[in-house]
Amino acid sequence: MANTITYETLFEKDLQERLARPQNWREVCKVTMTNTRVINSQSISTAGDWAAVGTLTRGTAFDPTDVAEVADTLTISTGRHVTTYFDFGDLAQSPWTNEREIFSRAGERLGEFIETNVLAQHASWRNIGLVGGVWTDNNSTAGAASAANIDDLARLIRRVIREQNGASLMAKNGAFATVAPATFEFVEAFAQANGFGSADDALKDGLAPQVKYLGLTWYVSNDNASDHAMAGIRKVQRLGILQGTFGRMHKFPGIAGTSGGIQSGIAFHSRVDIGHLTPTDHANLVLDVNDTNS
């Protein structure tokens, strides 16, 4: 015997919450919002890394040190968009597809693009590699961060910054690392195994991303380039964003159809235009950690 049953269907009033990818670019980059295409920033260049100290003999002439200004250029020219089209009938009949939801998700996607694009600039940064199980400055050998070496990595990042004369800037802005979840797990394990009150807290609650530990602020990202993680001093890497397009939402009703007519619907459009710069004088203060966990 088999009955035929019609079951009640329940529809939730809201779309399922989107699983957003972490975004850290606002925290680690110096962000400039402008409608200017090209941004020039100057640095001073001399053979003596500023004005060289010379010998002075009383009553004897001396020569000054020549100083030259060097321009670093950031060009805002990389554009991306998120554009979706909906039929007017579908918009009227779907309680889930509304402008707030559409533009909110478009904004998240564009922010995720910026995150990925920032982390893709690793070729401009100073390398840290893993050689024979030891984190090594100015080396591009890839290796995996682990429970045995995560504290060594944190100490090396801070040491390299000091050796590159970035101690005062580190004290002002702070040092950071943007790592994969697998690497952050080892930071969490280290915190749970060391200390007293802090270890108890870490055992009870774990560590939340953007936590300061081992002298660094640790960020988590799922968008690091393969085998690369970003570290160094916060607000050194430059990011330019075109102010006139960022966060703007546009609606285009009745867009052209494939047959030459128009479609009975509306397109929702948002875009972002960006550019990057690793400043010449501070290039050694942004680090490419060659971590295979990424």
Language-model region placement:
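Sequence/fold signature of self-assembling virion shell proteins
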Residues: 3-9, 13-22, 26, 35-38, ...
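Long, acidic, intrinsically disordered low-complexity segments
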Residues: 29-63
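Short helix/loop capping segments that flank catalytic or ligand/cofactor-binding pockets
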Residues: 49-53, 94, 186-189, 277
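Long, hydrophobic/aromatic-enriched structural stretches that serve as scaffold segments
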Residues: 58-104
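Extended, solvent-exposed, turn-rich assembly/linker loops in the middle of proteins
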Residues: 128-205
